[in-house]
Amino acid sequence: MSEITLGRYLFERLNQVDVKTIFGLPGDFNLSLLDKIYEVEGMRWAGNANELNAAYAADGYARIKGMSCIITTFGVGELSALNGIAGSYAEHVGVLHVVGVPSISSQAKQLLLHHTLGNGDFTVFHRMSANISETTAMVTDIATAPAEIDRCIRTTYITQRPVYLGLPANLVDLKVPAKLLETPIDLSLKPNDPEAETEVVDTVLELIKAAKNPVILADACASRHDVKAETKKLIDATQFPSFVTPMGKGSIDEQHPRFGGVYVGTLSRPEVKEAVESADLILSVGALLSDFNTGSFSYSYKTKNIVEFHSDYIKIRNATFPGVQMKFALQKLLNAVPEAIKGYKPVPVPARVPENKSCDPATPLKQEWMWNQVSKFLQEGDVVITETGTSAFGINQTPFPNNAYGISQVLWGSIGFTTGACLGAAFAAEEIDPKKRVILFIGDGSLQLTVQEISTMIRWGLKPYLFVLNNDGYTIERLIHGEKAGYNDIQNWDHLALLPTFGAKDYENHRVATTGEWDKLTQDKEFNKNSKIRMIEVMLPVMDAPTSLIEQAKLTASINAKQE
């Protein structure tokens, strides 16, 4: 085979970088492209219920596998995906957005085609995507098309940001040399400037030598930019107390003896707040300092000795070193750390979150008790997905087992995101290890935005746990403003009718309302095997919420009300 179609070239390249599942919807400008998926062994087309859900699914898949691909059609399809793509941009998730666009000749003639604005402007939607993409490409020349595809895939992976790739309908069947596939896409980072890297490492080593009470704080980009291994080695080598932010959940081993808890500024447990804020050196890995990730910017460090390791720069106190990538800098730092910590005497880490006290099994479920108890259900390697709202805050008090991965859209916060993300994560988990469990916690209100994607889970035989927290509406919004306002009410659904309604045959339904019912279900051996899709409706009081969310809601309401 000396030549292959451009469409097949795209999917062969994605297959080479371990993207096996493609998300999206068919439309007449991408149909010929979609044909080529079935020509590549091991590739599959998920086929989503709508483009927004497809974007969410691509995000969830990419968080587990490193990058993903969504395919939409020109105009109506691509615009429906943009909320999800914007979330991936905000949260550093590598999603390749491929858009099937009208033929080059149709564009040149400015034909009044369907899915256009009727004004002959065929670049308007491309321009809309530009501000939420790391880079964009509109392929117009078959000779350079393979190189453009390679560039887009590399950029998606390296930067962990969305990339837009427009493919005209008339080009995807044209042939390109198959030999090009023999040279793998280079997914490696370019080395740091040696002088700048050495200055960074030497400066950090001096700070470490002088520190008596240093801490390590792991955040979102420790996972997104692939430095989890380096961060673990840093903790092991230094024995410094180590903490995560809400967006950093799962980035380090929470069962490690030097793990101290989740730091969220004023919303932290008092002992965690004291441990972090009294440190004389803070090594911050992959920080993403958003409001809900910092307790509304309530970090209150006493020290000025703060080192921020980022994907493309490092900041030490007030000095910034642009272009110095944390992955290589951490690796070089690790080589010299043993000598630098010779004088360090480990300080105690905060005590673990205490277990729930025994109570009457008939006690009605409440959020504080439930989130403490969730940790007993979790297993090593689980993917834990928590929706914006009570779930995203409650999970902060749930210790993760080793190698668990947390997914929560703390920065972008688009409600309903996690249903689609659960689908994508379930595909990814199945590809990595069919025994790997995917567990979703979502509110009844959020579920109503994206519930259709459960049907896609059923269609593909995926087996996630779907915990629906039924607290009769938008509790997080009620806490911020409008406790009894009608706009925070929703229609009550029969959640246990959803799986059979969507055509499930092998499934389980459960409803739990008491502590005894929760324990009986989550401790059941068969229930703990991911052998089928499960819907678990969790009955909770309307205004019940984790303490941290109640406090965050007060902070948010105060900020929203400020006049200047």
From Swiss-Prot:
Cofactors needed by this protein, per the record, are:
Mg(2+); thiamine diphosphate
Q: Where do the annotations place pyruvate binding?
A: 28, 115, 477
Enzyme's top EC category: lyase
GO CC annotation: cell surface; cytosol; fungal biofilm matrix; nucleus
This enzyme catalyses: a 2-oxocarboxylate + H(+) = an aldehyde + CO2; pyruvate + H(+) = acetaldehyde + CO2
Q: Does the keyword Magnesium apply?
A: yes
On subunit structure and binding partners, the annotation says:
Homotetramer.
Q: Which GO terms describe its molecular function?
A: magnesium ion binding; pyruvate decarboxylase activity; thiamine pyrophosphate binding
A Pfam cross-reference name: TPP_enzyme_M
Q: Where does Mg(2+) bind?
A: 444, 471, 473
- Which keywords belong to this entry? Decarboxylase, Lyase, Magnesium, Metal-binding, Thiamine pyrophosphate
Any single biological process term in GO: aromatic amino acid family catabolic process to alcohol via Ehrlich pathway
Free-text cofactor note: Binds 1 Mg(2+) per subunit. Binds 1 thiamine pyrophosphate per subunit.
InterPro entries recorded for this chain? Answer: DHS-like_NAD/FAD-binding_dom (IPR029035), PDC/IPDC-like (IPR012110), THDP-binding (IPR029061), Thiamin_PyroP_enz_cen_dom (IPR012000), Thiamin_PyroP_enz_TPP-bd_dom (IPR012001), TPP-bd_CS (IPR000399), TPP_enzyme_TPP-bd (IPR011766), TPP_PDC_IPDC (IPR047214)
Q: What is its EC number?
A: 4.1.1.1
Residues the entry annotates as binding thiamine diphosphate: 390, 413-415, 445-446, 471-476
Q: What is this protein called?
A: Pyruvate decarboxylase
Q: Which domain of life is it from?
A: Eukaryota
